[in-house]
Amino acid sequence: MDKLPPSMRKRLYSLPQQVGAKAWIMDEEEDGEEEGAGGRQDPSRRSIRLRPLPSPSPSVAAGCSESRGAALGATESEGPGRSAGKSSTNGDCRRFRGSLASLGSRGGGSGGAGGGSSLGHLHDSAEERRLIAAEGDASPGEDRTPPGLATEPERPATAAQPAASPPPQQPPQPASASCEQPSADTAIKVEGGAAASDQILPEAEVRLGQSGFMQRQFGAMLQPGVNKFSLRMFGSQKAVEREQERVKSAGFWIIHPYSDFRFYWDLTMLLLMVGNLIIIPVGITFFKDENTTPWIVFNVVSDTFFLIDLVLNFRTGIVVEDNTEIILDPQRIKMKYLKSWFVVDFISSIPVDYIFLIVETRIDSEVYKTARALRIVRFTKILSLLRLLRLSRLIRYIHQWEEIFHMTYDLASAVVRIVNLIGMMLLLCHWDGCLQFLVPMLQDFPHDCWVSINGMVNNSWGKQYSYALFKAMSHMLCIGYGRQAPVGMSDVWLTMLSMIVGATCYAMFIGHATALIQSLDSSRRQYQEKYKQVEQYMSFHKLPPDTRQRIHDYYEHRYQGKMFDEESILGELSEPLREEIINFNCRKLVASMPLFANADPNFVTSMLTKLRFEVFQPGDYIIREGTIGKKMYFIQHGVVSVLTKGNKETKLADGSYFGEICLLTRGRRTASVRADTYCRLYSLSVDNFNEVLEEYPMMRRAFETVALDRLDRIGKKNSILLHKVQHDLNSGVFNYQENEIIQQIVRHDREMAHCAHRVQAAASATPTPTPVIWTPLIQAPLQAAAATTSVAIALTHHPRLPAAIFRPPPGPGLGNLGAGQTPRHPRRLQSLIPSALGSASPASSPSQVDTPSSSSFHIQQLAGFSAPPGLSPLLPSSSSSPPPGACGSPPAPTPSTSTAAAASTTGFGHFHKALGGSLSSSDSPLLTPLQPGARSPQAAQPPPPLPGARGGLGLLEHFLPPPPSSRSPSSSPGQLGQPPGELSLGLAAGPSSTPETPPRPERPSFMAGASGGASPVAFTPRGGLSPPGHSPGPPRTFPSAPPRASGSHGSLLLPPASSPPPPQVPQRRGTPPLTPGRLTQDLKLISASQPALPQDGAQTLRRASPHSSGESVAAFSLYPRAGGGSGSSGGLGPPGRPYGAIPGQHVTLPRKTSSGSLPPPLSLFGARAASSGGPPLTTAAPQREPGARSEPVRSKLPSNL
């Protein structure tokens, strides 16, 4: 303001006359700053501002201005004292006009008195801003301060003036003094001009400060405070401050309904009303003397509080319905209260009974004491009942408190409602009980009232109250009449009144309780209503019972008895709160999923916010192979099976995900996924998937790498993914740390797949496995004939064979596998692994000691298939090297057996040794890591026969020729003609020529006639030449090595030799052993009934499907020997002569055989022949217990001999 020109300042000073009172106050504040600066303003401006005051004479004013303008130095030196006097005088004049800025100007003036004028101006403005910011505008109550105190600072100011003025060295000093005097006189004239008032100014100032502090504190209690309830009601702290300003501007002593004062006052009145409504009925009814001192004091104090409350209601703001507006205008408050509850509150607050007693006692004491005493007492008691009208006030306050609790705590609101309802019912019962006794008491207890009948007129008030309350509650609950039925007319009417009131209260209580219970569990009620609609829908469309049950189960698992509109609930929340809730709901999914555990938390949050919850039932196909993929899924709970066309099945459990491959390649589904249990999944759409991965390229790379690894595990490839991953690796987009994270995610995914395989293998293991010897019966063409032969009848002699011995064959269409696929069926493999490795051993399982088709045949199964690379951890190394006598042979291991046992200690060693090198000849890239190192030629040579052993001779060996000489070439796996991508189906490995095997020592006499004209088994590739990478040559023969007791197919089917038999395992009672002679006769019957094999049957056998290579199908083709040679024992047939099981017969296999039912070549005799070129099969035999007795090898019968 000091920098403004005088004309502009004059215009600003004239603004309060044109604007309202608020602008006047603001102008005074600004002018107060100038006055505190040292008195440089013209005193004539003060006359403009104080227009109601008589202005000084113009000559004096002109002299003042001239003196100030003539001597500026004297003004500066005298400025502090003069400014203190001026600001104090004018400031106090302004203060009682309603401006709080006068305090700041006074403080600034006093501060300026201690220093220069500029310092005083700075101190004044800072102090003024601090006071205004702390207290706001002045309350209207300050306008009522007595004006006589306005001259309070005048005496100190005038006293300070001579002290601050130097001796009369400057001529303008008297003019300055004369300039000061009119201002002071003017101020005194305004405030009354009394000289005596100057003597009491210091005490008045102290009183004013104390009263101002108390007034401010009490005024703050009348305003709404910044608490939880106020913030919830008004929305923000700024809104609460605006409401406080409304209270200040509304007038003097206006109480806000949400203020702290009103809160505590209502609480006090609530407790006082409850006490009155309980004590007053008891005192009126059961106590005759009401003029005792305690009773009078209680009534007087209560009436006084209620009268004060009546007055405060005129100054308390009224809340309009629905909290839309709060009325703070005093006139509107008064009119609204007078029209509503004023009459009731006034009557209940006035002590009418005491007023009546005072008036009556002054009329005539003698009359009062005699004739009118009883009537006056009765009327006084009736008038005292008017205090019970305070119940209306109690109901209003309780309702207000319910609103407060409802706005603050929802659960507390429900509890308060129930407590209020119960309390009101008990209060009505209390009143009704007092009424039941009050009516007979006012009638002076007539003879037919219930009090006289029961003889309780002179009893204690406690006993009278108890029976009266019992009678009232019996009426109100409609359960009786108390001790007896009413007799008098007054009792009858009272009983009817009690019944009506009680029935009303009972209905209200039931209704409120029901509504409260429903409100406490609204989600369950909503679910029940929804499911009723579903039941009506199913009935309307007449759905079958199975479908209805599935719908019921789905609703139970999906909603679990509670239904929420989760999308709308989350949509109404803020984004940070919504993300926090979603992260909490999906915490189990994140904890069980390695992908999220190794990912960026921002990526996890972005992914979770876009997930959608879904539930699938067992048997539901979540995705189907060949369809267009629009979603991927994350498993929270449940187990799913991943199925491909090659029957390659994989299990996925909690924490896994699937369906991301087609989202990455924008192609079609590569596999089908079926739910095995109830699955709770989270789905992610393709749009959201791409949106998230655009922000996190490293996670896209992780998804692509895991997808490639999964495709490789199921034997498929995707060039698009391979090209993307290879491009990222070559370009070096990701650093070392990111690549490590991606590799860790891939390793976790593999581990989860292996865990799922272990769970599946454990689940498929049964206590009594189905004999696998009967599996080919379903797949063979002569199924019906085999089922009716005596072989089946003979085998059914054993009581331990399961009923479901014929199992259905696997589905057709399994031969169309890609070049990179692993041709094996995990389900078939896992059903064989536990039975072969653990549960099929006769010694380890007592329930199977007498089963003819047990562990030894499972070893044959293990010898005829290859396992995918992911299954090597499933094969326990403890069962890979059994003792030599596991199948009846003496404990003298051969060198090749020891070599195989040593090699089988690794994860996949016993499978590789059993297959005899078929893995090494396969071109499948998936099996490359599983191939062991090169083996020595000695390991591929057949072992010599054990001197004391049975030699492993069985029934079938009597139909076979002796092994060929060393000139007979052996067959290599490559000469079977399979493509490079498929696994080799042959079981022989090693050099092209196999050393000559030793001769068999003996042949059983009862089968001697069946060996004539027999020739070795030979296999001829259809193409004539081997594929590239294999040694070409003419058709090779598989030499028939002498069978060992180690687990070859031949040894499994041959009867025991004449060597000393080992100790027999004791059989169960009532189970006769099967004799070899009977089995031999049954075998002759079957083998004689079968036709001969055609020559070109090898064309079909060479293209055996990958699935059939894992099955133990006993069908095979027999061909003439490629080259002649003298066998070491027994006569050989002529060259080129085909032979069957019986001389002169040809065993044929039908040409039209599906790939799913084709047996693998060498499934029986091939394994026997392979035993001469590979390690023994004892590595796949089950482990026996240390103390278990060995069981002799029983003959096993193939189904299509």
UniProtKB/Swiss-Prot annotation:
Lineage of origin: Eukaryota, Metazoa, Chordata, Craniata, Vertebrata
Comp. bias (Acidic residues): 26-36
Protein's organism: Mus musculus
Annotated membrane topology: Multi-pass membrane protein
SUPFAM superfamilies: cAMP-binding domain-like, Voltage-gated potassium channels
Biased composition (Gly residues): 105-118, 1122-1134
Positions annotated as glycosylated: N458
Protein name in the entry: Potassium/sodium hyperpolarization-activated cyclic nucleotide-gated channel 4
Residues bearing PTM Phosphoserine: S139, S1105, S1108
